[in-house]
Structures are given as structure tokens and as C-alpha cells.
Amino acid sequence: MQISAKESFFRHQCLLFLDIVNGSIYERELIGILSGDMKQVEKFSRAVPPERKESVLGLIRHPFFVTRSAGSLGADVVALRGDLSAIIEVKSSISDSIMFTEASGKRQEQATRMIKRLEASGTFLMYAYRLKGIRGEAWKTFAAPANPKGKIAYLYDFLPKLDTTRENNFYLKWERGKPLSEFIDYMNRLQSD
């Protein structure tokens, strides 16, 4: 069955809308976890390995201050706690990899722009990637290339880096990320020293 160009365009727009809506759902989920929302933290804690469950539940007592970033020029989420911060770009997909050159290369441009902006501040851009439709812990974390200064450099060294293609374009491979529960546990240990 042949569909018209108009119908094809409409279907494409609907898929884009659903992706945007779903993306914001997962962004709110991450914000709820990091900000210590009891319902979100308890739900997330059921998916993490037993050895990290206590660390995750500790977010209820010792949460991050989390805010959403406005507009498309900044990262999605900024999480602050004590003397550490995380500038986070949230990604979600049913695919286990995300190529930054997809969507007309806008992801690549955004990442490059953010990396340059954060370089002067001595911090780095972090990616939180949620794989849709998976049982268990669905969030993985990554760091964009940087040269951070101070205590935040320990966190940077702990996180796996974005992969790059031969053409130096970024991509995320979900299985190579560090589970969000490990990120939380490591932040707790960094701040207890």
C-alpha cells in the first residue's frame, strides 16, 4: 500500500512527538531519582544489585539538588550536592546505541558546543542513557571528553567515555556505560572522604 507524502510527513511528526514526550518522561524519572523522591528512588532501588541498594536508598536522606535546564543550548539536568556537580544530558532509546550524527547531526553539534562551554569551568558533560523496555537497571552513565579540575576529576576518571567513530563523531553504546547505581555509590564515597 502506497502512502502519500503528506501522510508520511504526518507519521514522521507523530513519531518525533512521541520521542520528545517519552524523553521528558525519562528526564523526570532521572530527576526524581537524584532528587530523592521516595517513590522514584524505591522503584529504582528494586532494579539495582543488592550491594548498591542501600546506597541508592540513601538518596532519600541525602539527595542532590536537581534542576532542569531550559532551552536547547544547555544540558537537560544539573545535579548538585556538596562540593560536586553533574551536568547531565539525558538520552533514551529502544536501541542499544545512539549515533550522534542521527537527527541531522544536531546531537553532535550540541555535544561539541557543550564540551567547549564546560571546558572553561573545569567540569564536564555527563550522559545518562536509559534503555527502554529492559528488565533490571535501565540507566547507564558516560562522560564526554574533557579535562576537569578538582574533585570532579575523580568522577570523570570513574565514568566510561563517549565512543567515537573514525570520523570523530560521538556515539553511545548502552552496554559500555556505568550503571546509574554505581555512579550514585561512587558519588557517596567521594563525598564521605
Language-model features: locations:
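Nucleic-acid nuclease catalytic cores
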Residues: I115-K149
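Acidic-basic catalytic patches of nuclease active cores, encompassing PD-(D/E)XK
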Residues: M1-S69
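A short catalytic or substrate-binding loop motif that flags glycine-/basic-rich loops and adjacent residues
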Residues: S69-S72, A120
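Active-site beta-strand-loop-beta-strand hairpin of nuclease catalytic cores
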Residues: G71-S92
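Mg2+/Mn2+-dependent nuclease catalytic core
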Residues: S93-M114
